[in-house]
Amino acid sequence: MAIKYRIKCPQCGEVLNTYHDTQCPKCRNNLYVNQPAMLQLYRKGNFYGFAGAFGIYINGQPYGHIGNKESLIFPLPYGTYNLHIAVGVSRKCNDLLFTLTPETPRMYAKTYIKPGFWTNSFGIEVATPDEMPND
């Protein structure tokens, strides 16, 4: 199975997964996966059994959730982005700031939970294409 694209409708804000160009189910706006740049995010599997979905925020805007061992592609225009991961009320995360340009149109990142003594936090690291799953 191919990796899903995660698209946010610029007209109504609806977030959806797709494998190809589609229409927003809420407002019928045309949505395209072919953007000049992209972020591929992989959530590493968790030994501790924490399989709840992680909330994804790009530039403070919600982009849905990512499940355990899931990989998603976010088609994005060129620009600077802040990636933040959170679950429920736990917002402790080392955000990833990245810029997509014609020279660097792709960003690969992996996220995981970092168990702590009192509370858990979330890690996000830059990754290489070789670290990304193929399906």
Across the structure, where does each feature detected by a protein language model lie?
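Short loop/turn and low-complexity linker motifs enriched in small/turn-promoting residues
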Residues: 1-135
